From Swiss-Prot:
Keyword Transferase (UniProt): yes
Protein name: Hydroxyethylthiazole kinase
Protein EC: 2.7.1.50
UniProt-listed HAMAP family: Thz_kinase (MF_00228)
Function: Catalyzes the phosphorylation of the hydroxyl group of 4-methyl-5-beta-hydroxyethylthiazole (THZ).
GO BP annotations, alphabetical order: thiamine biosynthetic process; thiamine diphosphate biosynthetic process
Keywords for the protein's UniProt record, in alphabetical order: ATP-binding, Kinase, Magnesium, Metal-binding, Nucleotide-binding, Thiamine biosynthesis, Transferase
Cofactors named for this entry: Mg(2+)
Organism (species): Limosilactobacillus reuteri (strain DSM 20016)
Binding-site residues for ATP, renumbered to this chain: R121, T166
UniProt GO MF annotations: ATP binding; hydroxyethylthiazole kinase activity; magnesium ion binding
CDD domains: THZ_kinase
């Protein structure tokens, strides 16, 4: 359930502060990620050059590391950037498809062993792979992975990170406390890049607060609420994407709280 003590005003603070997010991006979704970061009021940097690492890290308020289209060049860039960023900047890891490709999983484990990430954001099969949990899901998208709360908690404790496990019900945990997002939009699961966008939006929120817990919850609920509202004004995936970016770009704290009040369930209990 949504708790009153969560600092929902972070939405307005992102727009006021305009944090810079350095994205080591999935090239399939790089434009969507840049647009999403911009829509919430932050400024995206989409650098691909290792030689720029020091300068880009100095400019950035937070970093999002995405393994979606990892290759040798990007692996070098990621390590170079992380060496420059640690421990100065908040870091988000998006371990795309580590459950499907052993080499990706090996690389993700090496990053997690060598660097500390404030947040790990992935679907159930990806998070399960990081902790070697048994699951029957294959491919990039998660299927019906059992014990998702337990898997997320295990991952959070192992890597001393907050885990945002996204899916039918989004789970956020620090290994002790668990928050389950009350909102879900089916189109978010159909839209390529929804997770990538969320990872970088979380980074945007980390760029303006040291409260990682609130940043993860507010960013995740914001994206879900925008998805639900987009459903109301769209007829298919194409028009939904337009409405989704519109909702992201106009939603502020007041609008989100009004959305809670309009909902059929009492989300604020």
């Amino acid at each position: 359930m949504v708790q009153r003590q969560i600092n929902w005003s972070l939405i307005d603070r992102v727009r006021a502060k305009n944090p810079i997010v350095l994205n080591l991006a999935n090239l399939v979704t790089i434009d969507k990620v840049a647009d999403a970061v911009s829509a919430v009021g932050a400024s995206p940097i989409m650098s691909v050059e290792p030689a720029e690492a020091d300068e880009m890290v100095m400019l950035a308020n937070a970093l999002s590391i995405n393994l979606g289209t990892i290759n040798e060049h990007q692996a070098t860039q990621i390590r170079t950037v992380l060496r420059a960023a640690t421990p100065l900047k908040p870091l988000v890891l998006d371990p795309v498809a580590v459950s499907a490709v052993p080499s990706r999983l090996k690389f993700a484990h090496s990053l997690l062993n060598d660097f500390h990430f404030d947040v790990i954001r992935g679907n159930a099969s990806e998070i399960a792979a990081l902790v070697e949990a048994d699951n029957t899901s294959h491919g990039i998208d998660a299927g019906k992975v059992p014990n998702q709360v337990q898997i997320a908690e295990t991952c959070a404790r192992r890597y001393h990170s907050i885990v945002v496990l996204t899916g039918e019900t989004d789970i956020i945990t620090d290994g002790q406390v668990v928050y389950e997002n009350p909102f879900s939009a089916e189109m978010l699961t159909m839209n390529v890049g929804s997770g990538d966008m969320l990872s970088s939006i979380i980074a945007a929120f980390l760029g303006i607060t040291t409260n990682t817990w609130d940043a993860c919850i507010v960013a995740t609920v914001l994206v879900s609420a925008a998805g639900v509202l987009a459903n109301r004004y769209s007829v298919g995936l194409g028009s939904w994407q337009v409405q989704f970016f519109d909702q992201l770009s106009i939603m502020d704290t007041k609008a989100l709280l009004e959305f809670f009040d309009e909902s059929e369930e009492d989300y604020l209990d």
